[in-house]
Protein backbone atom coordinates (compact mmCIF):
# COMPACT_ATOMS: atom_id res chain seq x y z
CA UNK A 1 0.00 0.00 0.00
CA UNK A 2 1.13 3.67 -0.13
CA UNK A 3 2.60 3.43 3.39
CA UNK A 4 4.96 0.65 2.25
CA UNK A 5 3.53 -2.29 4.15
CA UNK A 6 0.78 -4.88 3.79
CA UNK A 7 -2.59 -3.13 4.09
CA UNK A 8 -4.66 -3.81 7.21
CA UNK A 9 -7.41 -5.43 5.11
CA UNK A 10 -4.98 -8.20 4.14
CA UNK A 11 -4.71 -9.27 7.80
CA UNK A 12 -8.42 -10.09 7.76
CA UNK A 13 -7.90 -12.19 4.64
CA UNK A 14 -5.03 -14.10 6.27
CA UNK A 15 -7.22 -14.77 9.32
CA UNK A 16 -10.28 -15.76 7.28
CA UNK A 17 -8.22 -18.18 5.20
CA UNK A 18 -6.84 -19.92 8.31
CA UNK A 19 -10.29 -20.20 9.88
CA UNK A 20 -11.82 -21.55 6.66
CA UNK A 21 -9.07 -24.17 6.32
CA UNK A 22 -9.62 -25.27 9.94
CA UNK A 23 -13.39 -25.64 9.48
CA UNK A 24 -12.99 -27.52 6.19
CA UNK A 25 -10.34 -29.86 7.63
CA UNK A 26 -12.48 -30.70 10.66
CA UNK A 27 -15.64 -31.28 8.67
CA UNK A 28 -13.81 -33.38 6.05
CA UNK A 29 -12.46 -35.65 8.80
CA UNK A 30 -15.96 -36.40 10.08
CA UNK A 31 -17.94 -36.00 6.84
CA UNK A 32 -19.18 -39.61 6.91
CA UNK A 33 -20.66 -39.03 10.38
CA UNK A 34 -22.59 -35.87 9.43
CA UNK A 35 -26.11 -35.50 8.04
CA UNK A 36 -25.48 -35.12 4.30
CA UNK A 37 -28.79 -33.29 3.83
CA UNK A 38 -27.75 -30.51 6.22
CA UNK A 39 -27.45 -27.13 4.56
CA UNK A 40 -25.34 -25.37 7.17
CA UNK A 41 -22.08 -23.47 7.13
CA UNK A 42 -20.06 -21.06 9.23
CA UNK A 43 -20.47 -17.27 9.12
CA UNK A 44 -18.33 -14.68 10.84
CA UNK A 45 -20.28 -12.62 13.37
CA UNK A 46 -17.44 -10.55 14.79
CA UNK A 47 -13.72 -10.07 14.21
CA UNK A 48 -11.54 -7.93 16.46
CA UNK A 49 -7.98 -7.47 15.19
CA UNK A 50 -5.16 -5.96 17.23
CA UNK A 51 -2.45 -4.76 14.83
CA UNK A 52 0.89 -5.12 16.64
CA UNK A 53 3.54 -4.68 13.93
CA UNK A 54 3.88 -4.13 10.22
CA UNK A 55 4.08 -6.91 7.67
CA UNK A 56 6.27 -6.11 4.68
CA UNK A 57 5.86 -7.42 1.14
CA UNK A 58 7.19 -9.77 -0.09
CA UNK A 59 7.25 -12.21 2.77
CA UNK A 60 5.63 -15.24 4.31
CA UNK A 61 2.80 -15.17 6.82
CA UNK A 62 1.69 -17.94 9.17
CA UNK A 63 -1.55 -17.86 11.14
CA UNK A 64 -1.99 -19.80 14.36
CA UNK A 65 -5.53 -20.58 15.41
CA UNK A 66 -7.15 -21.89 18.59
CA UNK A 67 -10.77 -22.47 19.50
CA UNK A 68 -11.20 -21.05 22.99
CA UNK A 69 -14.93 -21.55 23.55
CA UNK A 70 -17.74 -23.49 21.91
CA UNK A 71 -21.32 -22.54 22.66
CA UNK A 72 -24.62 -23.89 21.39
CA UNK A 73 -24.45 -22.25 17.96
CA UNK A 74 -21.20 -20.27 17.97
CA UNK A 75 -17.55 -20.48 18.88
CA UNK A 76 -14.78 -18.09 19.81
CA UNK A 77 -11.62 -18.46 17.75
CA UNK A 78 -8.31 -16.80 18.64
CA UNK A 79 -5.71 -16.09 15.96
CA UNK A 80 -2.08 -15.01 15.81
CA UNK A 81 -0.57 -13.64 12.59
CA UNK A 82 3.19 -14.27 12.41
CA UNK A 83 5.91 -13.18 9.99
CA UNK A 84 9.70 -12.93 10.10
CA UNK A 85 9.86 -14.38 13.61
CA UNK A 86 7.39 -12.03 15.28
CA UNK A 87 3.68 -11.73 15.97
CA UNK A 88 2.25 -9.00 13.74
CA UNK A 89 -1.36 -9.23 14.93
CA UNK A 90 -3.75 -11.06 17.20
CA UNK A 91 -7.45 -11.46 16.59
CA UNK A 92 -10.55 -12.82 18.26
CA UNK A 93 -13.42 -13.94 16.06
CA UNK A 94 -16.89 -15.27 16.73
CA UNK A 95 -18.13 -17.77 14.16
CA UNK A 96 -21.76 -18.85 14.05
CA UNK A 97 -23.11 -22.12 12.68
CA UNK A 98 -25.66 -20.92 10.14
CA UNK A 99 -28.61 -22.68 8.51
CA UNK A 100 -28.56 -21.67 4.84
CA UNK A 101 -32.28 -22.40 4.38
CA UNK A 102 -33.72 -20.60 7.42
CA UNK A 103 -30.99 -17.92 7.29
CA UNK A 104 -30.45 -18.12 11.03
CA UNK A 105 -28.08 -19.62 13.57
CA UNK A 106 -28.53 -23.27 14.42
CA UNK A 107 -27.00 -25.59 17.05
CA UNK A 108 -23.56 -26.95 16.23
CA UNK A 109 -23.83 -30.76 15.88
CA UNK A 110 -22.12 -32.58 18.73
CA UNK A 111 -19.82 -34.43 16.29
CA UNK A 112 -18.53 -31.09 14.98
CA UNK A 113 -18.12 -29.71 18.51
CA UNK A 114 -16.07 -32.74 19.55
CA UNK A 115 -13.93 -32.64 16.40
CA UNK A 116 -13.22 -28.91 16.83
CA UNK A 117 -11.83 -29.54 20.30
CA UNK A 118 -9.35 -32.22 19.15
Regions found by a protein language model. Give the residues of each.
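Terminal targeting signals and extreme-terminal segments of soluble enzymes
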Residues: 1-62, 68-118
Amino acid sequence: DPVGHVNNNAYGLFIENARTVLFMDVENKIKSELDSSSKCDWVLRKLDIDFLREIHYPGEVDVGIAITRIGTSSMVVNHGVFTSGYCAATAVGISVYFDLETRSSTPIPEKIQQAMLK
